[in-house]
Amino acid sequence: MKISYLDFEQSVAELDAKVEELHALNQPGIADDISRLEVKARKELQRIYSKLGAWQTVQVARHPQRPYTMDYVQALFTEVQVLAGDRAFADDQAIIGGLARFNGQPIVWMGHQKGRDTKEKIQRNFGMPRPEGYRKALRLLRLAERFALPVFTFIDTPGAYPGIGAEERGQSEAIARNLAVMSDLAVPIICTVIGEGGSGGALAIGVGDRMLMLEYGVYSVISPEGCASILWKNAAMAAEAAETLGITARRLQGMGLVDEVLAEPLGGAHRDPEAVFALARERFAHHLQELQAMDTSKLLTTRYERLMHYGVVGAA
């Protein structure tokens, strides 16, 4: 797969282009030149990512080649069955979910799903769920509780869809109900931010016993552009807003909002998805084993205490 380079990666793009040119020449005696350029490109990528800012991290989190929910589901789970619809209005394809097995154990999974091409982006509403998407997730949550199945959620959305129709059909109610149900669901819930975690649209499937986050994911109450538009009346201030919001994985972990940060390959998950899947598989198994060692009462008490801990000054 040919990598799409972000604006701040252009120096790496130029070096990689030179490597490709030399490969295309296919001449003897240039192997050392190719190796030298490859080492230089890697060092340049390391230099860039060693001092990545919050706004640059946002761009990595939004990278169009980044693995999406269905990529994780297909890589981590077996016997995957997709369930559709909220049994009330429609099937919102911005949220997908269903049943599967993880290491042979039946589970319920759900997550936001963005599109790869224009047609799919429109079909999935750019990963912005409507109320029926959250009600589909609610249906799956209740199914999980009924059959005592652990839940895995994958978070990757700019936010809930703010359209008039969505508001008319109860967007805020759908999100609020999911928060209430997930806070008291009598099965283990493991949530993972794999890309963007946009406000209530992310939180609606983000209440659980563990919050994992990929190294170059972001999680915030509002997008940097939205914040900049409100505070400075200028979306061009998004970079400053991103730094101010504290949206990166390490910073959120430091505040006690994220339990574990999953390291990504140099340059982001899209450069080596298999490495990310392998790490996720290992950490999912670890956390699930810990949670399943608790009885239901202990599980719910721990979750309640965890939620009440959020926002307490000095708690982290």
Swiss-Prot record:
Signal peptide positions on this chain: none
Subcellular location: Cytoplasm
Pathway involvement of the protein, from the record: Lipid metabolism; malonyl-CoA biosynthesis; malonyl-CoA from acetyl-CoA: step 1/1
Domain CoA carboxyltransferase C-terminal: from-to ranges: 40-290
This protein's UniProt keywords: ATP-binding, Cytoplasm, Fatty acid biosynthesis, Fatty acid metabolism, Lipid biosynthesis, Lipid metabolism, Nucleotide-binding, Transferase
Enzyme Commission number(s) of this protein: 2.1.3.15
Membrane spanning residue stretches: none
Gene Ontology CC entries for this record: acetyl-CoA carboxylase complex
Entries under Gene3D superfamilies matching the protein: 2-enoyl-CoA Hydratase, Chain A, domain 1 (3.90.226.10)
Catalysed reactions listed for this entry: N(6)-carboxybiotinyl-L-lysyl-[protein] + acetyl-CoA = N(6)-biotinyl-L-lysyl-[protein] + malonyl-CoA
Gene Ontology biological process terms, A to Z: fatty acid biosynthetic process; malonyl-CoA biosynthetic process
InterPro entries: Acetyl_CoA_COase_a_su, ClpP/crotonase-like_dom_sf, COA_CT_C
GO molecular function, one term: carboxyl- or carbamoyltransferase activity
Family recorded in the similarity comment: Belongs to the AccA family.
Quaternary organization: Acetyl-CoA carboxylase is a heterohexamer composed of biotin carboxyl carrier protein (AccB), biotin carboxylase (AccC) and two subunits each of ACCase subunit alpha (AccA) and ACCase subunit beta (AccD).
Function summary: Component of the acetyl coenzyme A carboxylase (ACC) complex. First, biotin carboxylase catalyzes the carboxylation of biotin on its carrier protein (BCCP) and then the CO(2) group is transferred by the carboxyltransferase to acetyl-CoA to form malonyl-CoA.
Name of protein: Acetyl-coenzyme A carboxylase carboxyl transferase subunit alpha
